[in-house]
Amino acid sequence: MDSKVVIYTDGACAGNPGPGGWGALLQFNDTSKEIFGYELDTTNNRMEITAALEALRILKKSCNVEIYTDSKYLQQGITAWIHNWIKNNWCKSNNEPVKNADLWQKLYAELSKHTIIWKWVKGHANNSGNIAADKLAVQGRETAIEILKCRG
């Protein structure tokens, strides 16, 4: 597992819930890949998780990965909270179901394939990778908005 991949992720939503997009910038050696997508009715947190999930899914082999996110929800959820959620059968300490459990479960399944370090970065603070991921997420969100406009 010599390969090191750096990933920047972001999510964007027009309303919460509303049309949303996710984006990720993957960097490996001197190569970069940009990916993005959208959902017509979603939340900002779902888009944040989806960005990380889709970025990890695109990796073809086990890698050392650094994931940068400006979402404390994503970073804390995957590094701290998820262990108790699993122990409590995807319920929080107050016995309420974990929001977005479907995506958390899929993201958790991807963790075993890689060695991952999760890092939080301040959003909109001149971090070029975060800025690129934000632009991709906005592109996804705008695509969703255009589709909804066409549907009338």
Curated annotation (Swiss-Prot):
Cofactor(s) in the UniProt record: Mg(2+)
EC number: 3.1.26.4
Main location as per UniProt: cytoplasm
Superkingdom of the source species: Bacteria
Subcellular compartments: Cytoplasm
GO molecular function, one term: nucleic acid binding
Key words of the record: Cytoplasm, Endonuclease, Hydrolase, Magnesium, Metal-binding, Nuclease
Assigned GO CC terms: cytoplasm
Pfam families with a match to the protein in the record: RNase_H
Residues reported in the UniProt entry to bind Mg(2+) 2: D10, D134
First-level EC class: hydrolase
Entry keyword Metal-binding: yes
Enzymatic reactions: Endonucleolytic cleavage to 5'-phosphomonoester
GO annotation terms (biological process): DNA replication, removal of RNA primer
Residue ranges annotated for the RNase H type-1 domain, each copy included: 1-142
Cofactor notes: Binds 1 Mg(2+) ion per subunit. May bind a second metal ion at a regulatory site, or after substrate binding.
Residues the record lists as binding Mg(2+) 1: D10, E48, D70
SUBUNIT field: Monomer.
NCBIfam families in alphabetical order: PRK00203.1
Known function: Endonuclease that specifically degrades the RNA of RNA-DNA hybrids.
Family: Belongs to the RNase H family.
Record protein name field: Ribonuclease H
Gene name linked to the record: rnhA
